[in-house]
Amino acid sequence: MSTFVTLSSGQRMPLVGLGTWKSAPGQVKQAVLAALDGGYRHIDCAAVYGNEQEVGDALALRVGPGKALRRDEVFVTSKLWNTKHDPEDVEEACRSSLTHLGLSYLDLYLMHWPMAFKDTWKAMENLVDKGLVKAIGLSNFNARQIDDIIAIARHKPVVNQVECHPYLSQADLLSHCRSLAVCVTAYSPLGSGDRPWASPDEPSLLADPRLGAIAERYQKSPAQVILRWNVQRGVVCIPKSVTASRIQENLRVFDFSLSPEDIRLIDSFNRNTRFIIPTVEKDGKKVWRDGEHPHFPFHDPY
């Protein structure tokens, strides 16, 4: 049973990685160490998470000459933040991430959000030319925006990282990305129950009794069933945890398969629910905080 996908760049990207968004200072280093010691070979981070230095401290203990792992055995992703989209700022932002992480190159560098993006993409392509990153990709882009990038790209995006879980199955976007040889990575694949803006009336994915019933049949946890569902669709998952036992549990999804019937059943849970869009109150109603930005990606159907 394959544990990785092959990107259009030829790189092998492990299907399950450790996410580090919302991991509190002081916890990230131990989480990364627990992940690497437990078999993870894929770490996902970003400048805006504010914890690349801690990730780097952990990598320094386990990766490199004389350490447990060679650099080419660990796939490391980071992301360019919105305030660094000026082409003049892109290389400096990338080098800053590399310094914090203690690395000479990134396996993958993503544009975190589609703000002004065509000139930014060209600057990111230069990072590939200079050997600072092996490949570049996108995050939170809709189908139209992906097409816009591909139309001008010298180095095509290899990944689009988006929110993806049974309540937001992204079937249309996944199909579009497949047709372009763009791999989809799922962030918040377990529904991000600890997101800062969650309200009590929102549904809890992990507590869905239908998932619980499926998990019981396979003698797995609901989290493992969700991750397996995405993995079987060829979607890379980066669940975040700082708990060693959960970090291990999330990787144990390669010793069972869901039946086609159960895959279809979980597909049917889709309700196009996005958890990862900060909302604000406006005229007594909740609205998407960045919804009026000209490049806001979620007004399109997918």
Stretch-by-stretch model annotation:
Residues 41, 104-107, 134, 158:
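Short acidic/polar active-site loop segments enriched in Thr and Asp
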Residues 53-64, 94-98, 124-125, 146-147:
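Short, well-ordered amphipathic alpha-helices
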Residues 70-84, 107-114:
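A short, structured active-site edge motif that brings together acidic residues
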Residues 90-110, 126-130:
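CE4/NodB-like, metal-dependent polysaccharide N-deacetylase domain
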Residues 113-302:
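Beta/alpha (TIM)-barrel catalytic core signal, keyed to glycine-rich beta->alpha loops juxtaposed to Asp/Glu
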Residues 23-36, 85-101, 144-147:
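Short, acidic/polar
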Residues 1-74, 190-193, 293-302:
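N-terminal binding-site loop/beta-alpha segment at the start of enzyme catalytic domains
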Residues 22-26, 46-54, 83-88, 114-117, ...:
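Acidic-and-aromatic substrate-binding clefts and catalytic sites of carbohydrate-active enzymes
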